[in-house]
A protein has these predicted regions:
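Carboxylate-dense, calcium-coordinating segments in secreted/extracellular and ER-lumen proteins
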Residues: 465-472
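Asparagine-centered strand-capping/turn motif at beta-strand->loop junctions
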Residues: 49-53
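C-terminal motif of bacterial Sec signal peptides marking the signal peptidase cleavage site
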Residues: 5-9
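Short acidic/proline- and small/hydrophobic-mixed sequence motifs that coincide with surface turns
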Residues: 42-44, 54-59
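Beta-strand/loop edge motif enriched in small/polar residues
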Residues: 11-17, 24-35, 40-42, 46, ...
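Short, solvent-exposed loop/linker segments at beta-strand-coil boundaries, enriched for Pro/Gly
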Residues: 65-87
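Cytochrome P450 C-terminal beta-domain/meander region
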Residues: 460-464
Length: 487
């Protein structure tokens, strides 16, 4: 039952009318609940019913026209339209210059189909005058498969088809491989995620990517889907004995930590990420601790912590876009943070990569100079790194000892953040959390990559030209239709 309370603020004495000329006013004519998974309750929606007619109005009944055939639940001014009352309430009053609030939820039945099904009902306000006023209730119901606290102990493949909604941890045990097939989408509930002790292979393609996202299909505001919010699920965690993992053409977004990689044997490849996106995370987008990881043609963007955080290991990055425009907290960290504070950094090689964001310095490096006691380290951890043909928003390196680590690097000017957004990318809209990190024609990243080391195609499998661009996306001039002179 919807536990809500009605609001009343009116004259003690009101003159009620039965004239058909006096009508209620509604804040909306249609309550749209968007898409919900069948059998899963929706979030609550509401609207106001006001009386500006000059006289008090009394409803002989307020009822669901279809009863409960489509699963809508309604509370009118604190009165639940219960099945015991025939999904209606009698004698609802709206005094002159007063308003009441109506709350609506829906839980839909299974549709027995693959496509979303539209559901409609109407909430009927029958006035004492005999006039009936109606508000449409609209929702879409989508059948899904559900897994709860699932543990995978043998090789298993998740195929495209029905949406898969995950509750709790999805654990891949040591010795098992979880394969996610092209076109599959996994929807993770709050607190759910993938814990990989064995092996994970996301086999997306340019035409059929793998999508890993939260399970909220509704909107926070009319202009803002919940899917654009961060921290909706727990992301992917690769544990210390997990090796040979691969994520290709995978879109992972709106998690807490996107991908975490625990400390492991640096002599073995733990993870390869190619042609993928990790976006809008409330923790790190990608955090690597003393592991061997390769990232190429990928977008790591918008995280409260670092878009890419590295502590030790062997990490190679090529043709990636690391962009820190996280909108929800001004204390966001950097686009890139690499260090050897806890573990030796055997090598960190970053080629043909765009590193930028709101801050004037979006790259942080942690060189070990102290030991665990805080004293000067006699033999500090190895700290080997190199940047080649990159564009980096950081103060220009002039120290002679540091210069050999930066080859053909463009250090961005200290322009304001808005200029960085518009100069580099097609769209950065923090208000609507709407982003397009493909290059704008004004970006200095265009034609700056090394043809010898750049990837042959970009994040979206678009071929790079003979003068490839820095970052995950190759710039292509968008064709505009020529005006028809006869029109």
């Amino acid at each position: 039952m919807l536990g809500v309370f009605g609001l009343s603020a009116c004259d003690d004495i009101d003159d009620f009318t039965t004239s058909p000329n006096n009508l209620l006013t509604f804040s909306t004519d249609t309550v749209r609940i968007d898409t919900v998974f069948s059998t899963v309750p929706s979030s609550m929606h509401d609207f106001w019913v006001s009386n500006r007619s000059g006289k008090g109005l009394r409803c002989t009944s307020v009822r669901l026209e279809g009863g409960n055939q489509n699963g809508f639940r309604v509370n009118v001014d604190g009165v639940y339209l219960s099945p015991e009352q025939g999904y209606k309430a009698n004698g609802i009053e709206v005094r002159n210059k007063d308003s009441i609030r109506v709350f609506v939820e829906v839980t839909t039945a299974v549709n027995h189909g693959d496509a979303p099904k539209e559901l409609n009902d109407r909430l009927v306000f029958a006035l004492e005058s005999g006039v009936e006023q109606k508000v449409v209730l609209n929702a879409w119901s989508w059948d899904a498969d559900f897994v709860r606290n699932k543990t995978i102990t043998t090789d298993y493949t998740i195929t495209a088809g029905k949406p898969l909604v995950v509750y709790g941890p999805l654990t891949v045990e040591e010795g098992a491989t979880l394969t996610i097939a092209p076109g599959a989408t996994l929807y993770f509930h709050d607190g759910a995620g993938i814990d990989v002790k064995g092996r994970l292979v996301c086999k997306g393609t340019a035409d059929q990517p793998v999508t890993l996202r939260g399970d909220r299909l509704d909107r926070m505001f009319d202009y803002l889907p919940y899917d654009r919010m961060s921290g909706l699920w727990n992301g992917i965690h690769f544990l210390e004995k997990s090796y040979d993992n691969r994520m290709e053409f995978t879109d992972l977004h709106s998690a807490f930590h996107g991908v975490r990689v625990d400390s492991s044997d640096v002599a073995r490849q733990t993870l390869t990420i190619a042609n993928s996106t990790i976006h809008n995370c409330q923790g790190h987008a990608l955090y690597v601790e003393k592991s061997k990881v390769t990232v190429e043609n990928s977008q790591l963007t918008n995280a409260l912590n670092n878009c890419l955080g590295v502590d030790g290991g062997d990490v190679q990055v090529n043709n990636c876009t690391l962009a820190q425009f996280y909108p929800f907290d001004s204390n966001r960290a950097s686009a890139l943070n690499f260090s050897a504070l806890k573990h030796p950094l055997q090598q960190f090689v970053c080629r043909n990569t765009l590193i930028t964001g709101y801050s004037a310095d979006e790259m942080m490096g942690g060189k070990p100079v102290k030991d665990a006691t805080g004293e000067d380290a006699a033999e500090p951890n190895a700290f080997n790194y190199k940047f080649e043909n990159c564009v980096i928003r950081t103060p220009e390196v002039t120290d002679e000892e540091e210069l050999p680590h930066f080859v053909n690097v463009v250090f961005e000017e200290k322009e304001n953040a808005d200029s960085v957004c518009t100069n580099h990318f097609k769209k950065v809209d923090g208000d609507k959390q709407d982003y397009d990190f493909r290059l704008a024609k004004t970006s200095v990243a265009i034609d700056r990559a090394d043809p010898a080391t750049a990837t042959k195609t970009d994040r979206n499998a678009i071929p790079r030209d003979e003068r490839p661009d820095v970052g995950a996306y190759e710039f292509k001039e968008e064709k505009t239709e020529e005006p028809n002179p006869q029109e």
